[in-house]
Amino acid sequence: MSITKDQILEAFAAMSVMEVVELIEAMEEKFGVSAAAAVVSGGGEAAAAVEEQTEFNVILTAHGDNKVAVIKAIRGATGLGLKEAKAMSEAAPVAVKEGVSKEEAEALKKELVEAGASVEIK
């Protein structure tokens, strides 16, 4: 006599929770296995890392040889005065803009690189 999967499922459905626990313990003993779920460590961190970054920081790493053009580009992007933009260019590495979209960060990077600066997006 062969028992089908459906018959086994029906038998499980008719059991109380205590009977199912006892059955599982008996199966663990008979087959030498454990019914404990495998724990995947770090799963939450990996899922967070997979999410696409939405805010970027544009970091000026060096002003390069054409300092005047870089200062003008900084002023245009940030609205800072001449003195503040000059101080920012001399303080490299420094964040020119923080929390901007990817498109805005790429556009600013392109503008600063064309002016002669070294730039990173983080």
UniProtKB/Swiss-Prot annotation:
Single GO cellular component term: cytosolic large ribosomal subunit
Function: Forms part of the ribosomal stalk which helps the ribosome interact with GTP-bound translation factors. Is thus essential for accurate translation.
Domain of life from the UniProt record: Bacteria
GO molecular function, one term: structural constituent of ribosome
SUPFAM superfamilies found in the cross-reference section: ClpS-like, Ribosomal protein L7/12, oligomerisation (N-terminal) domain
UniProt keyword Ribonucleoprotein, yes or no: yes
Species assigned in the record: Shewanella oneidensis (strain ATCC 700550 / JCM 31522 / CIP 106686 / LMG 19005 / NCIMB 14063 / MR-1)
Classification via InterPro entries: Ribosomal_bL12, Ribosomal_bL12_C, Ribosomal_bL12_C/ClpS-like, Ribosomal_bL12_oligo, Ribosomal_bL12_oligo_N_sf
Protein name: Large ribosomal subunit protein bL12
One GO term of the biological process aspect: translation
Quaternary structure annotation from Swiss-Prot or TrEMBL: Homodimer. Part of the ribosomal stalk of the 50S ribosomal subunit. Forms a multimeric L10(L12)X complex, where L10 forms an elongated spine to which 2 to 4 L12 dimers bind in a sequential fashion. Binds GTP-bound translation factors.
Keywords assigned by UniProt, alphabetized: Ribonucleoprotein, Ribosomal protein
Family as reported in the entry's similarity comment: Belongs to the bacterial ribosomal protein bL12 family.
